Amino acid sequence: LQRMGHDVQHLQPKVEFHPLHPVWKMPFVWSKRLLRKCFGGEWRLPVFEHPHRWIRRYTDVFIYKHIEMRPLSDEEWNASLAKDYDVFMVGSDQVWRPCYALPLERYFLSFLDDTGSNPRIAYAASFGTENCEFSANQILDCRKLLQKFSFVSVREQSGTEICKRIFGVNASHVLDPTLLLSKDDYLKLIQDQSPSKGNLMVYILDETPDTQLF
């Protein structure tokens, strides 16, 4: 997008860290969350500061060096954002998977109202699985939101079927955005890095007997 002459910002939810509860209090905390879920509330896993920072200690350095970020609190996700941008785009990896994308409706651009004329685009959006994991209420809400999009594309072929069957929207099957870059783009990113000293990083999304043997 930048090479096409566009100014691009990534809207990033501000992470709200939760204090660690004492051990004796944990059964009450989790029971409360379970009851909230049983009565139709949203299941949200708490994010604790120290593990979160440890996990992201390398990725955050890369992200903030190469991507222009705009962190937003929950209150800042509102229709006033429409005046700051010409187009809103959502994508790609598992942005439409309820267990990861919270609150889910935000990833369908629910914070925009119907008064603005900003085009809404989904590029290589992913449901994360071959089956729709949305609840009945989420389907109703997100169907209305998705039908307001100017263009919808998804990363997996199964996603086109979900869009048509569940949401009544025609979606194109496109490449993941990481594959839009050339080999040279990635070589430039690592040109100043020291060669590995025999270490191998393995990223396993779904553990299987074969990957365990590996």
Regions found by a protein language model. Give the residues of each.
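Hydrophobic alpha-helical packing residues
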Residues: 1-2, 163
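Generic low-polarity alpha-helical segments
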Residues: 2-5, 188-191, 214
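Aromatic- and Gly/Pro-rich donor/ligand-binding loops
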Residues: 2-144
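Amphipathic alpha-helical segments that form well-ordered structural scaffolds
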Residues: 62, 162, 213-214
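A nucleotide-sugar donor-handling region in carbohydrate enzymes
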Residues: 71-72, 78-87, 96-100, 124-205
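Redox- and metal-dependent alpha/beta enzyme cores, enriched for Fe-S-associated oxidoreductases
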Residues: 206-214
